[in-house]
Amino acid sequence: MSETITPDVHEVNPAARRTAVGARRPFYRRRKSCPFSGPNAPKIDYKDVRLLSRFLSERGKIVPSRITAVSAKKQRELAQAIKRARFLALLPYVVN
């Protein structure tokens, strides 16, 4: 007498029960807005060393836009302004 036993779904996949019972709301990171967009946003200028130095790391490298939340267009302008300021010796290429 062979009986076929159908296993319960929760016994086969314990992760399925965990997601159903202890389901949490997923964490949504707040979308950052570009610091150079908006009505009173600062203009990117190679002579504004204080503004440009905010977007440089401790080593003098340009910080990527995924960290600074700068839009792609403004990141290109920012990189160009930083490179221009470096060329004119307003900003250092590297920091020791």
Curated annotation (Swiss-Prot):
Keyword annotations of the record: Ribonucleoprotein, Ribosomal protein, RNA-binding, rRNA-binding
Q: Write down any Gene Ontology CC term.
A: cytosolic small ribosomal subunit
UniProt-listed InterPro entries: Ribosomal_bS18, Ribosomal_bS18_CS, Ribosomal_bS18_sf
Give the record's GO biological process terms: translation
Q: Which SUPFAM superfamilies match?
A: Ribosomal protein S18
Any one GO molecular function term: small ribosomal subunit rRNA binding
Keyword Ribonucleoprotein set for record = yes
The organism's superkingdom is given as Bacteria
Q: Which family does it belong to?
A: Belongs to the bacterial ribosomal protein bS18 family.
Quaternary structure annotation from Swiss-Prot or TrEMBL:
Part of the 30S ribosomal subunit. Forms a tight heterodimer with protein bS6.
NCBIfam families xref list = S18 (TIGR00165)
User: What does the protein in this record do?
Assistant: Binds as a heterodimer with protein bS6 to the central domain of the 16S rRNA, where it helps stabilize the platform of the 30S subunit.
HAMAP family per UniProt: Ribosomal_bS18
* Protein name, per record: Small ribosomal subunit protein bS18
Species per Swiss-Prot/TrEMBL record: Gluconobacter oxydans (strain 621H) (Gluconobacter suboxydans)
